[in-house]
Amino acid sequence: MSSLYYANALFSKYPAASSVFAPGAFPEQTSCAFASNPQRPGYGAGPGAPFSASVQGLYSGGGGMAGQSAAGVYEAGYGLEPSSFNMHCAPFEQNLSGVCPGDPAKAAGAKEQRDSDLAAESNFRIYPWMRSSGTERKRGRQTYTRYQTLELEKEFHYNRYLTRRRRIEIAHALCLTERQIKIWFQNRRMKWKKENKTSGPGTTGQDKAEADEEEEEEE
């Protein structure tokens, strides 16, 4: 009871809203009336509003795009020409051959160069002296045993030049080749000549005659 009394006393101190504001102070206008006011440009649905026309085109024909094409909608809404939608990639396709690494002209040039190199290699002539085989190797210095050297020195002491028959006999006896016997005697004669430089010219002539005789026997 006391709470109701205090509530009535509180609200009785403030007057009603209708008594405070005079009637007609605020005109009653709805949002639709505000939007349709012709004095406010840009908000009405006038004939010069392209965006509203495009929106109407979007939702015409049952709320879909069946009644109007996309080109027509954008043309009406944004002022684009119909030729703007007919763009193609012809310039890009024309310049693609120059940009792409697989250029047919370059590929043909590389192929011709390769063919010319192969033809030049095939025509290159290789002579026998230019060929190197793995079996051929530098011959090392021949070493003779003590027995072989002793026997060769004995033979050289008796005869400084050997006939072919005698050279073959010594080669078989010492297990050497004829070429090895011949080389050894040549080196031994050179050594002997250096040791006997003080000898007269008669000795040199005699050695030359013996050498010629040995060459005739070899033939």
Curated annotation (Swiss-Prot):
Q: What does the record list as coiled-coil region(s)?
A: none
Region: Disordered; residue ranges are 193-219
Q: Which residues bind DNA?
A: 137-196
Q: In which broad location class does this protein mainly occur, judging by the first location in its UniProt entry?
A: nucleus
One GO term describing the cellular component: cytosol
GO BP term, example? embryonic skeletal system morphogenesis
Give the location in the cell: Nucleus
Q: Where is the composition biased (Acidic residues)?
A: 210-219
| Record bears the keyword NAD | no
- What Pfam family is a match for this entry? Homeodomain
Q: What keywords tag this UniProt record? A: Developmental protein, DNA-binding, Homeobox, Nucleus, Transcription, Transcription regulation
Q: Where is this motif: Antp-type hexapeptide?
A: 126-131
In the UniProt record, does the keyword Nucleus occur?
Answer: yes
The organs and tissues expressing this protein are described as: Predominantly spinal cord and kidney.
* Organism superkingdom: Eukaryota
SMART domains (UniProt xref): HOX
Which Gene Ontology molecular-function terms are recorded? DNA binding; DNA-binding transcription activator activity, RNA polymerase II-specific; DNA-binding transcription factor activity, RNA polymerase II-specific; RNA polymerase II cis-regulatory region sequence-specific DNA binding; sequence-specific double-stranded DNA binding
Family note: Belongs to the Antp homeobox family.
Subunit: Forms a DNA-binding heterodimer with transcription factor PBX1.
Function, as annotated, reads: Sequence-specific transcription factor which is part of a developmental regulatory system that provides cells with specific positional identities on the anterior-posterior axis.
Q: What is this protein called?
A: Homeobox protein Hox-B7
Q: What's the source species for this entry?
A: Rattus norvegicus
